[in-house]
Amino acid sequence: FASVEVGWRSMLYLTVTGRNDWASQLAYSKNSSFFYPSVGLSAVVSNMVNMPEWFTFLKVRGSYSKVASAFARYLSNPAYSFNNQTHNWSKPSTYPAYNLKPEDTKSWEIGLNARFLNHINLDVTYYRSNTYHQTIYAPLPSSSGYNQVVVQAGDVQNQGVELALGYNNKWNDFTWSSSYTFTLNRNEIKRLAAGEVNPVTGETITDNEIQKDWLGASNVAPQVILRPGGSMSDIYVNHELKRDLNGNIEIDPSTGNLSIAETDFRKVGQLSPRYTMGWSNSFGYKGIELGAVLTARIGGLTYSATQGVLDYYGASQATADARDRGGIPINYGTVDPQKYYSAISTAEGGYGAYYLYSATNVRLQELSLQYTLPARWFRNKARLTVGFVAKNLWMIYCKAPFDPEISAATDNAYYQGVDYFMQPSTRNFGFNVKLQF
């Protein structure tokens, strides 16, 4: 690793870095190492030209970087797996992949830092990155002795904006510090493996989608499907209540039952938020400091398999309310709640089209109050601060039946904000004492 930084007259700064890594995953590749550089240039405009008196500082910057990372182990040298229950060894199902390349991410960004009116500071960044050589699995015929082979392809682009706006001021003994942050990211799949050549069969790959995990315990849940032009978190559903030619939900006239039809996959949204925001404030007066942090996640969907299971067994608040109302309004009448919920839910979860919720939420993330005792009490030789802090204190707005920010910590198959009988989010309270000499 090497890094060089050059400055000129406190106006221009150039930074160049280079790094070379050797990875054991590349043991059977032509190149057993990979190099990735970066370069950044910044200019302090306020030191180069005369600025208005109220504009105290302005710096613009730009950078380009390439980051490489090795793929998962055993792709180039698959290992046999041992079953602790049957005490049998099984051969790998993935064809050994040779001459693999590291996954590359090429990115650039531009931004500025500004301070003006003596109290306001602004930091804005725009970035774009593309990731290549991703690991994609292509199917193999059973005659090969394997199920799949690794193909390195794809192009996934991320671009977005990060903004931070701050304000600091003091009036005699009263101080106020405020900070607002805004982040926006747009993710797009530019290309998958279609058009690449299968290294084993020599055939051109035509599949142009990748079906990822179901967002629950069974295939009644929504599914994440990757397609060119979409994002890495697009949600699709393929089960809905049967409808007639006029679009009305079909109800069996003799039994009053409803039924689910399997349909083509239909995109209904994505897991990722449209943007996120945060606003923190700190107020101080004669040793007393009050702080508050508000956060907001806007957009995106979330799925609750828990709600589906509770509805199926008639144990949810929704089923109780439906019984009290005398039924579920459908078409021009009502349907028995038991028949409705037994149609759209199962013992393992709910059909995705009916158990997706907006992940938008606004909360009071943190509230703190602290007091610093007068230094004269300690003969000006020490400072003692006592404080109280509460986190995740108040969910101001949330339409989902659970906290959309929770995530499973033990199973990678579930995404953040997907609920399958997970532990509820917690509200924390703390007390702290800080002594400084």
Name each model feature, range by range.
Residues 151, 170-271, 399-401:
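Conserved small-residue
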Residues 95-97, 101, 127-171, 242, ...:
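Outer membrane beta-barrel strand-and-loop segments of large Gram-negative receptors
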Residues 1, 77, 81-122, 149-171, ...:
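Outer-membrane beta-barrel signature, preferentially recognizing the C-terminal barrel domain
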